[in-house]
Amino acid sequence: MTRKVSRRLQELQKKVEDRAYEPLAALNLLKETATAKFPESAEAHIRLGIDPKYTDQQLRTTVALPKGTGQTIRVAVIARGEKVAEAKAAGADIAGSEELIEEISKGFLDFDLLIATPDVMPQVAKLGRQLGPRGLMPSPKGGTVTFDLEQAINEFKAGKLEFRADRTGIVHVLFGKASFSADDLLANLKALQETIDRNRPSGAKGRYWRSVYISATMGPAIEVDINALRDLKLAEA
C-alpha cells in the first residue's frame, strides 16, 4: 500500500532538488523545510557499507555533539552503596539499586538513558525484555557501563549520545534541533561524521560511506554530499 503524502510535505519536497547538496546548503534547506507546528529535530540517516549480522561489521558507539542535542534527557542510574548517592549528587534524575531493578522489571521506564556500574550488570542484564526493545540496555561501548558516574552523567546531559547501525547498516541519529543555527548543526553533523569514521568496524570492506540524508522531523529528505562533508575543516569554535 502506498503511503499518502500530505499536501504540506508535497510542497516542501518541491524545494529539494534530486542531487547531493554541500553540507551547509543542505542544513539551510533543512531549516527552511521545518514548518511543522512543533519544535522539530534535525535527523541524519546514514547508510554504511557494513553488514551488522557479522560481529566485525557492527557499529555501536557514542558521539559528543559540540552544540548539544537541544533535548533535556532524564538519566537513570543503577548502582550500589555510596555510588547511588554519588549519582544523585552528579545530577541523575533517578538513582537506585535492587529496588530500581525491581521497578523496571515491573514496567517503570520513565527515563531516556540508563547508566549502570559494572558490579550490577549481571542483575541489569536480566532486564533485557524491558530495556532491549527501547535501546536502553547499558553497554560498555555506549559509555553507559562505568564506575565514573559523575563524568558519564555530565557528558550525556551535555550532549553526548549513543548510536548504532541498525541491521540494514543504517545509522539514524538526532543531531540537534531545527531551530539551531545552520553553523551549529554543521558542527554537530561534522562531529557525527568524524566519530563514524573513527569507529569504522574492522570487517568493513569496500566503500564505507554509501549515502547521507538529513531532514527535519516532518520534513523531506535532503541528500548531503558525503565527500564534501568528510573533507570539511571547521575552525575551532
From Swiss-Prot:
InterPro entries per record: Ribosom_uL1_bac-type, Ribosomal_uL1, Ribosomal_uL1-like, Ribosomal_uL1/biogenesis, Ribosomal_uL1_3-a/b-sand, Ribosomal_uL1_CS
Molecular function as annotated in GO: rRNA binding; structural constituent of ribosome; tRNA binding
Keyword set, alphabetical order: Repressor, Ribonucleoprotein, Ribosomal protein, RNA-binding, rRNA-binding, Translation regulation, tRNA-binding
Keyword Repeat: no
Gene Ontology biological-process entries: regulation of translation; translation
Domain of life: Bacteria
GO annotation, cellular component aspect: large ribosomal subunit
A Pfam family the protein falls into: Ribosomal_L1
CDD domains, A to Z: Ribosomal_L1
NCBIfam families per the UniProt record, alphabetical: rplA_bact (TIGR01169)
Quaternary structure, from the entry: Part of the 50S ribosomal subunit.
Stored HAMAP family: Ribosomal_uL1_B
Family: Belongs to the universal ribosomal protein uL1 family.
Functional note: Binds directly to 23S rRNA. The L1 stalk is quite mobile in the ribosome, and is involved in E site tRNA release. Protein L1 is also a translational repressor protein, it controls the translation of the L11 operon by binding to its mRNA.
PANTHER family associated with the record: 54S RIBOSOMAL PROTEIN L1, MITOCHONDRIAL (PTHR36427), LARGE RIBOSOMAL SUBUNIT PROTEIN UL1M (PTHR36427:SF3)
Name of the protein this chain belongs to: Large ribosomal subunit protein uL1
Organism of provenance: Synechococcus elongatus (strain ATCC 33912 / PCC 7942 / FACHB-805)
Lineage, top ranks: Bacteria, Bacillati, Cyanobacteriota, Cyanophyceae, Synechococcales
